[in-house]
Amino acid sequence: MTHLVIVVYNRYDNLKHWLECWSQCDQTDAQLVVIHNTDKEDWQYQHLCEVYNVTYIQRPNVGYDIGAFQDVCRGRLNFPDWQRLLWVTDDTFPMSKTFIKEFNDQMEPGTGVACMCVSNHVKRHIRTTGFMIDRTTAEKLTFCADPVTSKEDCYQFEHRSRRDTFLEQVERMGLKVKQVA
């Protein structure tokens, strides 16, 4: 099963739009999980997820989206048992009703990550606004800080590290990174 994770901070309308989109998509073998980075109880996000029958996880607002990803990779959240994640930020929306299948189709043997965009800006890297990864690959990833706490920690993971960016780590594992067309 694929777990689609939407990481949200304070954009309630984005989450609402996401859930409306999700209700129209092919959800075969997929479960949606919302991770809410916040420092306060915010019942409206949780209630919205309940209305759509979506798993809701609240965590401290530390480390942005990559901090939340690190917490899932390290088993620090009450997250459902998972084998494959499709990780997206709340400002990235599906453009196809079959987007889960399109990502899953790229995850053939020898592929570590399927992503929306491999960017050459700054240096070649995986844009972390939308990517799919399997648990085995995710558990091998390293981060420049544990826990990830700052925007700079996130940038180091994504594209600033000299040799340990997300993409470089996956490729050193002997795995491919594929862009979903």
Residue positions per predicted region:
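Conserved donor-nucleotide/metal-binding helix-loop-beta segment in metal-dependent transferases, i.e.
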Residues: M95-V122
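A conserved hydrophobic helix/loop-capping motif in glycosyltransferases and polysaccharide synthases
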Residues: T2-Y12
